[in-house]
From Swiss-Prot:
The gene is hisF. It is an enzyme of class 4 (lyase). Keywords: Amino-acid biosynthesis, Cytoplasm, Histidine biosynthesis, Lyase. IGPS catalyzes the conversion of PRFAR and glutamine to IGP, AICAR and glutamate. The HisF subunit catalyzes the cyclization activity that produces IGP and AICAR from PRFAR using the ammonia provided by the HisH subunit. Belongs to the HisA/HisF family. This is Imidazole glycerol phosphate synthase subunit HisF. The active site is at D12, D131.
Length: 268
């Protein structure tokens, strides 16, 4: 059986509104989250992701009411992340109507939350999100990744909304997350995020090949072809995008019809 490839709109939330920036900066308003999620539901999105991008940084919990409102109107899986630090936080989000939770900063600080979450709620509920960036300094412990121009670097995990480097190698962290019970990896490259120049194929492929769980490629979509490249060259299981959907440059259906025409299995 051929697994269908998923198209996932991502809604970055700040103060209950959808925002979008470039390279994690310059945020601008993109609309009401429930309204946008409903639109993507109608267009045939496979899932929707809500990420409260300031929750971890500002030590603020996610707005439960917003999730309840969205979950009441959606008929597709909803993943929610941002500011989830404890099992109780995870349980609250799942009870509010989310199908999965995304753990990022908290998982780096306390990797045992991945294991505890998987044991309590099932591996299918636990998505480990990684914000990564290229690092060209010498690191014998890191997994080298060859870039398109032939140079080699390693990818560093960055936390707190992309503001704090950790020294952790992204490929090794992905494998550890899998071993600890993560059901999926949500991978965002800070180099390509919001640029519309395409996914960071080098790191997407490296992590897709290293991990035995689904990898969601994120950061950089600008054209229909970029989705195709994410699946073929990047070997991702799902592709996530934000601004191209939020501002009406293309619809989820446009993407899926294009991919189907190129031989990529999708649910239409």
């Amino acid at each position: 059986m051929v697994l269908t490839r998923r198209i996932i709109p991502c809604l970055d939330l700040k103060d209950g509104r959808v925002v979008k920036g470039t390279n994690f900066l310059g945020l601008r308003d993109a609309g009401d989250p429930v309204e946008l999620a409903g639109r993507y539901n109608e267009q045939g999105a496979d899932e929707v992701v809500f990420l409260d991008i300031t929750a971890s940084k500002e030590k603020r919990g996610i707005i439960i009411e917003l999730i309840q409102r969205a979950a009441d109107q959606l008929f597709l899986p909803l993943t929610v992340g941002g500011g989830l630090r404890t099992l109780d936080d995870i349980q609250q989000i799942l009870r509010a109507g989310a199908d999965k939770v995304s753990l990022n900063t908290s998982a780096v600080h306390d990797p045992s939350i991945i294991t505890k979450g998987a044991e309590s709620f099932g591996t299918q509920c636990i998505v480990v999100a990684m914000d990564v960036r290229r690092n060209f300094t010498l690191n014998p412990e890191a997994v080298p990744v060859r870039l398109c121009d032939g140079t080699t670097c390693w990818y560093e995990v960055v936390i707190y909304g992309g503001s704090k480097p950790t020294g952790i190698d992204a490929v090794r962290w992905a494998k550890e997350a899998e071993e600890r019970g993560a059901g999926e990896i949500l991978l965002t490259s800070m180099e390509t995020d919001g640029t519309k120049n395409g996914f960071d194929i080098a790191v997407t492929r490296a992590i897709s090949e290293a991990a035995n769980i689904p990898v969601i490629a994120s950061g950089g979509v600008g054209t229909l072809e970029h989705f195709y490249e994410g699946f073929t060259r990047g070997k991702a299981d799902a592709c996530l995008a934000a601004s191209v959907f939020h501002y009406g440059e293309m619809s989820v259906r446009d993407v899926k019809e294009y991919l189907k025409g190129k031989g990529i299995p999708v649910r239409l």
